[in-house]
């Protein structure tokens, strides 16, 4: 059986990266909330 997690650096960056977050309204909200919470890392 094929597992669900098939690591790929490119895919990881494209879906969860900083620029990907910056593009959408929801993503910007994510960044804002993580900044407010004081997360050490904003994105992957």
UniProtKB/Swiss-Prot annotation:
Keywords attached to this entry: Ribonucleoprotein, Ribosomal protein
Superkingdom to which the source organism belongs: Bacteria
Pfam families: Ribosomal_L34
GO MF terms held by the record: structural constituent of ribosome
HAMAP family: Ribosomal_bL34 (MF_00391)
PANTHER family from the UniProt entry: LARGE RIBOSOMAL SUBUNIT PROTEIN BL34M, MITOCHONDRIAL RIBOSOMAL PROTEIN 34 FAMILY MEMBER
Alphabetized NCBIfam families for the sequence: rpmH_bact
Protein name: Large ribosomal subunit protein bL34
